[in-house]
Amino acid sequence: MGKDEYAYVLEYMPFGLPDSKDRKASAIVFTDSLSLLLVALKKDVKVDPGLKVYIGENKRDEVHHIIQRITPDKLSGNGLASLNDRIATIVKENEEKYIDIINKLGSINVRLHSLNLLPGVGKKIVQKILEERTKAKFKSYEDFNERVGFTSDIAKSIEDRIMEELNGEDKYKIFT
């Protein structure tokens, strides 16, 4: 995995965090690694939640520098809602990437398969996924849902799992 180039703005903090000296800040989520960060904005820049900003090595238009990594509990209610929306957008935009991850997931140990970590996936569904994977790799979320007979949407399960990982609720990481 390379360096992240883009991020989505989750919330704008005109006065930064209470424990931060930076005046204008914004909470962002990287589009690739899904890391949450607090960034200082350039002078006279105001950003809106949902805006995709460049944070790579070259000239940045909105972001001055990265202040620190943050956890979802540092976000306001609006920031948390925006995080859920942005994760859904990222999962939708990167369908090929996440289906490829599902096609490659293996066992964690003798008793636990990585697929079991996805919300809504139990032992029977894991067996069905493994069986279908041997026939042919999954090509899309729709293909996965149809072939496995998954009652909920796999994209939603991926979103939920990403949120669990960001909240630090599990020691095993699949997507973050």
Task: Name each model feature, range by range.
Residues M1-E93:
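Structure-specific DNA junction-binding interface
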Residues D4, M13, L117-P119, E165:
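Generic detector of intrinsically disordered, low-complexity, polar/charged segments
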Residues I90-L117, E131-T176:
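C-terminal extensions
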Residues G122-K123:
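Small-residue hinge/turn detector
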Residues V126-I129:
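Conserved hydrophobic/aromatic packing and binding residues within compact polymer-binding modules
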